[in-house]
């Protein structure tokens, strides 16, 4: 169980690290659009031909092309991480709890509706007549 939990945590860190890299690139891309349009154009072209899905691979490949930009991405990524990581544990727990409650409520509503529909469905007796217990016997 511990190894599985550790593996999940490591995979989560990798995804989060890539996402922070992506957010840093977006921030820099926006800044460059205002301060250095030629560099912004270069970055846009680079992004069009290189996947940022894996942040670490992206940075390794970019290192061969533009070391300054990599250093800037690293600094911005670290800054973003510093500003959000303290909030993540509590926000994640709360968000998951709220999501789970909403999904359980939706499931319960569906089950209740299904049971109500089954209860309202007219049953038939063995001779093909509707079984109506509300009418008086003849």
UniProtKB/Swiss-Prot annotation:
Residues 122-138 have a biased composition (Polar residues). Pfam families: RbcX. It comes from the Bacteria. Gene3D superfamilies: Chaperonin-like RbcX. It is found in: Carboxysome; Cytoplasm. The keyword Ligase does not apply. Keywords: Bacterial microcompartment, Carbon dioxide fixation, Carboxysome, Chaperone, Cytoplasm, Photosynthesis. GO terms for biological process: carbon fixation; photosynthesis; ribulose bisphosphate carboxylase complex assembly. PANTHER family: CHAPERONIN-LIKE RBCX PROTEIN 1, CHLOROPLASTIC (PTHR33791), RUBISCO CHAPERONE RBCX (PTHR33791:SF1). The homodimer has 2 functional domains, a central cleft essential for production of soluble RbcL in which the RbcL peptide binds, and a polar surface which plays a role in correct RbcL subunit arrangement. Homodimer. Interacts with the exposed C-terminal peptide of RbcL via its central cleft, contacts a second RbcL monomer via its peripheral polar surface. This is RuBisCO chaperone RbcX. It comes from Synechocystis sp. (strain ATCC 27184 / PCC 6803 / Kazusa). The gene is rbcX.
